């Protein structure tokens, strides 16, 4: 049956900012869906408030609204755009929950908008725990003993009957938000009370724990004619009890018998048919390792994290096919774009093993509980493809960028055996390495299996890796041993470390023995049909399937897994670079290993190498492809950190040279350059030892800002206030960047400003200047940023332009550059320079209409900006305002400090755009979860250093009609100032917070980072109970200003296309 005749315009709901549990996989699927609908001749309208994604570029959808996906806003867009249908199953939980609300509030019926794909009833059945259980029982599919509760009493009653442990799963949430495993009444009360608050409908499922059973997933697809296929089976390395997003996942399943596989495959098809899901769906099972007994854990009636993994694992474009099914096409009417011959009505076959490993943010949060369970904590993930599980696993490990090139880690090696055994007894981010070390120490596999419940098949594979390590260690590196090690997935660096030699020695020996990788294609059909797309992975000892053509081509190095400090902004830049190369008539090659992103879609570049981004892997591809050169400026710190090794091996870097990159990344060299250029910088010096640091501190006095070299996201950057804090810091920083200088600056309490520019070495174009709401000292990625800057004098603006031009020319920048400044009392200081794409490139490109990445690619290929129609200086500023707001995932990270500082903590960002500044800021606050009601109760607990700012703040709050509560010390100070507020103890404040008594909390930390401190507990409680929390006086002042001045009904709801037209007219008039 052809597509629906009455659907011509479709509204797609995006998933919003990157948060733990809802990351780039939804941008990938949403982008694919928009392209898929446009292929069918439909007009696509998109709503998504995430500026960092390629999805919100006007190249992807026809009309783009960067607005908050709320019922109120989306109703206005529906009224304005009059879509025929709405597609919500590709926007993660955000899209699904919004669709449910629009349907329940009668908005879809009011405007005659059809819910496309999976029906409202099917969504309700899959998402509502009670209805889902009933449906499974109807069709004879087993579900664990459980009860849906709306209060704590019913949960306790169930526990009394069935005993512990129990698993708690809130309804309509993602990433296991608010869930957990309870082992006693106290834990049950705590988890259930939180879960009820996190659930959109105030209900949670309490079920008997199946902890230790195998967790198996099936990705299934169904069309409206009831045609069904299973796309991929996946097996979690970790047993039930660890969220699948925090588990190592392998595809296809490795330890199931054919009977077990067919049993679960049949159940999957039965379930998707019973739920009448139209499109893709993910089904999770718990399988008893001792029998054929299984239970259905849950169904996601939408494209999910696992769908993105299954898509990349098989090459089957799930989101693309799901979008076409949503508009009425059947599976046998949709062409498989990978083979170009078969239809989408076939089940992919894999002749390789895929391994996904999560990337956790614990390098940013040292105080956080590193245990993993039912609530997801990973920010991103990597995927590897190889011919065996061992090789696939080792490839994935070295893709993580955690300084692991195999399963041997020095800090684990140094542990006592009892510490290792403790480490394997509880799921945590390091357990894989603890198990390998236990095997090295001859701990019995049966014992490890008993403790971890990880299948012995996997443990024996880990033992194979450990035995190979022993073989390498004991023998000469003969051709036979080196071949065997490479076939098993060992990196040159790991082999070198085991043998105590250099990586280049292993590389040279490998070449002497003619041991080179072979490259294979992912074709969805185990080579049964020829593939027309170029989706490639490496292996050893097999036939090479990849032909090399002598044509102009360029390699773009991607940014790897999503982590704090390096998010999808860099994937946006990589994708734009691939498109710019295509427009320039040059074949583009991307190297990346992130299954969630658009850059690793099979048709984004001309050729995709799904490989680790390490020196060895990149050099192998470079030597095979022989391109014009390599672009490192779009892959964040991942790509930048490879530059030195690439240049030493004769690789041509396109864009800014390695020498210039090194000057800007090395704190000592950079400081000298600024002195030569006569550019202001904070007073400071660089230290290599604790003694150096003490001497500098004596000269500069506290507070100081300290940071290592060659890191991203302000990793390990801190403001220190005492000598002891400084000494502790230096010891830690020398581990982060060994042998590299630590910069110690006098802290400047000024406004922070940043620019992104494009330079060709002579001409420097600055699209705009962004001003941060928070003072210097809060990481730029965690600051609210305003464009155009509002509080700079003409003289300060001219100085910023002049400094940017001087630095860009001195470094001979050919491409993008990002510079951060502090401005205090009319003096402009340069804080930092990054000669690469930064996380603000996507938002500045969207705000100003300047195609920054395209220009950077053209410049790197040798063009001049003047030839491209641009001149030096500041681009005309827009007549509208854009505000970037950070978005945090703190509620998922137990014991993480939530207050702002120099080290970045946000996982994503949203954008507020409006014709007025207050309107843009109000939208940004709302999108970031910091919306303050017009009236209500506000709690203040302020650090002494900020006391002088409190009286004016309280007067403002009282004038706006808020009822003020303060903790003892803050209240006492206000009383001395003659200001009366309600005073309560910190302990009582925390209790009232849990009861939902306060509408917002303003708390500036005294020390921070100590989970035992009451202030720390106060901040954590606010975050966990979703009460707006402000830890910076600057943010709350700006927020109150917006609340006081904004007329919510007067906010402009315009598409980015309309804003672009406003700016085009503005530029035209100014140029004339």
Swiss-Prot record:
Pathway as given in its UniProt record: Amino-acid biosynthesis; L-arginine biosynthesis; carbamoyl phosphate from bicarbonate: step 1/1; Pyrimidine metabolism; UMP biosynthesis via de novo pathway; (S)-dihydroorotate from bicarbonate: step 1/3
Needed cofactors: Mg(2+); Mn(2+)
Sites where the protein binds Mn(2+) 3: 820, 832
Record: residues binding Mn(2+) 1: 284, 298
Any Gene Ontology biological process: L-arginine biosynthetic process
Binding site for Mg(2+) 1: 284, 298
Cofactor note text: Binds 4 Mg(2+) or Mn(2+) ions per subunit.
Residue numbers spanned by region Carboxyphosphate synthetic domain: 1-401
Pfam families the record matches: CPSase_L_D2, CPSase_L_D3, MGS
Enzyme Commission no: 6.3.4.16, 6.3.5.5
UniProt keyword Protein transport present: no
Segments for region (Allosteric domain): 930-1072
Presence of the UniProt keyword Lyase in the record: no
Positions annotated to bind Mn(2+) 4: 832, 834
Location of region: Oligomerization domain: 402-544
Residues that bind Mg(2+) 4: 832, 834
Region Carbamoyl phosphate synthetic domain: start-end pairs: 545-929
Reaction catalyzed: hydrogencarbonate + L-glutamine + 2 ATP + H2O = carbamoyl phosphate + L-glutamate + 2 ADP + phosphate + 2 H(+)
GO (cellular component) term, any one: cytoplasm
Residues annotated as binding ATP 2: 707, 746, 748, 752, 777-780, 820, 832
Subunit structure: Composed of two chains; the small (or glutamine) chain promotes the hydrolysis of glutamine to ammonia, which is used by the large (or ammonia) chain to synthesize carbamoyl phosphate. Tetramer of heterodimers (alpha,beta)4.
Protein name per its UniProtKB record: Carbamoyl phosphate synthase large chain
Lineage, uppermost ranks: Bacteria, Bacillati, Bacillota, Clostridia, Thermoanaerobacterales
